Amino acid sequence: MAETLKRPGGELASRPLHFFWIVDCSGSMFGEKIGAVNHAIQSTIPEMADAAENNPNAQLLIRTLKFSTGASWVTSSPVKIEDFAWDDLDAGGVTDLGQAFELLSAQLMIPPMTDRALPPVLVLLSD
């Protein structure tokens, strides 16, 4: 799945870097807290895209996992940062972090994650 870049002196393989947003959407995050999370993530996207553009050795792939009463993928498949768009999340329910970790762990196995991938980045946002 590695994309090959043409460079002077030969080709360089771009390795996938999986970045996971793991967002607490339980009732305790209602109001200002989930608003701050939505704003923070939205604000980071351009910076992440710039960093990815300046690093030809990695292909930044984004996924979002939310949890409250249960857990589910907001972004079901990895999306290139340049194609990623954030949709604001709402809060309500109880905190089911265990279910989120189960869904996440299934995606961190090889496969579906490739052994050529860089170590993943996991960002947990919760109160």
Each PLM stretch: what is its role?
Residues A49-D50, N54-N57, S77, M113, ...:
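A generic "cationic amphipathic patch" detector
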Residues E3-A13, L61-S72, D96, A100:
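Short N-terminal helix-initiation segments at or just after the protein's N-terminus
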Residues N57-D88:
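Short beta-strand-loop
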Residues T69-P78, A117-V123, D127:
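A broadly tuned preference for mixed-charge, low-complexity surface segments
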Residues L17, G27-Q59:
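…and closely analogous acidic/polar surface helices at protein-protein or active-site interfaces
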Residues S72, D83-P119:
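Von Willebrand factor
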Residues M1-F20, C25-G35, M109-R116:
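Acidic, polar low-complexity linker/tail segments
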